[in-house]
């Protein structure tokens, strides 16, 4: 399952945050406004309306507002599931997360990390439920993803996050290097070139002025 190239614009991104929609197994209209990529119950992928570009750097109008106060530099990927779910006692509701969805999520996140050269750590690849603990940004009791209905032995945000990261790293290891631009490296190179283009005339004038001053001082001493 390959992500279409136009889903991954060439911009710097810092992290991937994974969610569930608390909805049906299909992507709703509201879901498409909130996330960059959605994974439906059968593993099918749906592109959200906001481009990842809008969340690069300072957020821009129309960005994907998927995580409170943590949208800048963050790619939002969400599983379409868990409508009516209850945290305690745990009840996955009528639309539980499926193993097929989870497996598709792993591939999607691995592809994003590979393309954007995001190193997999608890602060760069995490679930919404981990944001408050891992990044120190309050999230008002969000618990997605802290349970895997298809595997009841995995309980808690940290356990689910560790499973996510472990599987993403394994998937990345089996992926070939993508023949695409590195968003972070290319963006930095472009910014550096623009800065150099702007500064070079100033530097040249400064060097010229300094050289002329040096010549005048030498001539004074000779005379």
Regions found by a protein language model. Give the residues of each.
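Active-site-adjacent loop/helix surface patches within enzyme catalytic domains
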Residues: 1-123
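Basic/polar, cationic surfaces and motifs that engage anionic cell-wall
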Residues: 3-11, 82-223
């Amino acid at each position: 399952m390959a992500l279409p190239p136009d889903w991954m614009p060439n911009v710097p991104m810092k992290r991937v945050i994974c969610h569930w929609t608390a909805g049906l197994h299909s992507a709703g209209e509201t879901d498409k406004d909130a996330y960059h990529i959605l994974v439906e119950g059968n593993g099918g992928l749906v592109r959200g309306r906001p481009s990842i570009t809008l969340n690069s750097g300072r957020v821009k109008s129309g960005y994907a507002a998927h995580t409170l106060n943590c949208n800048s530099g963050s790619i939002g990927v969400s599983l379409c599931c868990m409508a009516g779910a209850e945290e305690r006692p745990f009840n996955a509701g009528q639309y539980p997360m499926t193993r097929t969805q989870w497996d598709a999520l792993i591939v999607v996140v691995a592809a994003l990390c590979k393309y954007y050269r995001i190193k997999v750590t608890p602060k760069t690849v995490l679930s919404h439920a981990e944001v408050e603990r891992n990044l120190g940004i309050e999230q008002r009791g969000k618990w997605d993803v802290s349970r895997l209905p298809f595997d009841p032995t995995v309980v808690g945000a940290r356990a689910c996050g560790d499973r996510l990261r472990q599987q993403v790293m394994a998937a990345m290891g089996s992926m070939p290097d993508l023949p695409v631009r590195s968003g972070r490296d290319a963006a930095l190179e472009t910014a550096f070139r623009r800065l150099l283009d702007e500064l070079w005339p100033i530097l040249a004038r400064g060097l010229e002025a300094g050289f002329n001053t040096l010549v005048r001082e030498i001539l004074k001493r000779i005379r």
